[in-house]
């Protein structure tokens, strides 16, 4: 896997608790992890003198690839026609280090009732596969401008549903920011994930846009 958010968060958290384990590599309160996708900046987060989490900066610029038909998404999550919104963006392959198909659903009920159809995922992987990755899907619903509710399914990678997917949340935050016409702005999103499987997580994503280009993408997870 070229990049994954939470392993970076966890490794950054643990190493920040024991900086003596990495002499010479811990300076100015930042670490740099070298990974297949590129260099990942990891910034420890503190409450007083206690490490409570990590911020990580996505290794790649946000990119969008091909679109995927609504019907394929509907089959994968066993929902009805009309459940997928395309007014902002059609279902699209996007990423900041690891690619996912990202699709917006009409309401919270559709999000909550989505069920992973592994056969449909296998069919989608045959028809709409991208790169060397299996077909993985993030669906989301906009609660409001800042609170986003999401679910991630990756059954072909052995994960029927993931409780927290930093790489997908980073891509989602960048996708949402790219839909805004402001040339210069900073966007902050709170992405709620894992609630339907009893493992709720909150991933904070911030994106800086300058001259209509996404310049910086950071996501933060508190361990405690």
Region locations from a protein language model:
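Active-site proximal loop and beta-alpha junction motif in alpha/beta enzyme cores
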Residues: 1-4, 9-224
